[in-house]
């Protein structure tokens, strides 16, 4: 998942979307 889709990708998972080197991470 790219950075642009990260917030939507992490939505509903009660996580904070972060982006490192173009990689989306959903951090609780």
UniProtKB/Swiss-Prot annotation:
It is found in: Secreted. This is Potassium channel toxin alpha-KTx 9.10. One of its GO terms (molecular function) is toxin activity. Expressed by the venom gland. GO terms for cellular component: extracellular region. Belongs to the short scorpion toxin superfamily. Potassium channel inhibitor family. Alpha-KTx 09 subfamily. Disulfide bonds join 3-19, 6-24, 10-26. Coiled coil: none annotated. Has the structural arrangement of an alpha-helix connected to a beta-sheet by disulfide bonds (CSalpha/beta). Blocks Shaker potassium channels. Its main location: secreted. Keywords: Disulfide bond, Ion channel impairing toxin, Neurotoxin, Potassium channel impairing toxin, Secreted, Toxin, Voltage-gated potassium channel impairing toxin. Transmembrane segments: none annotated.
């Amino acid at each position: 998942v790219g950075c642009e889709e990260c917030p939507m990708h992490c939505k509903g998972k009660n996580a904070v979307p972060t982006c490192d080197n173009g990689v989306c991470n959903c951090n609780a």
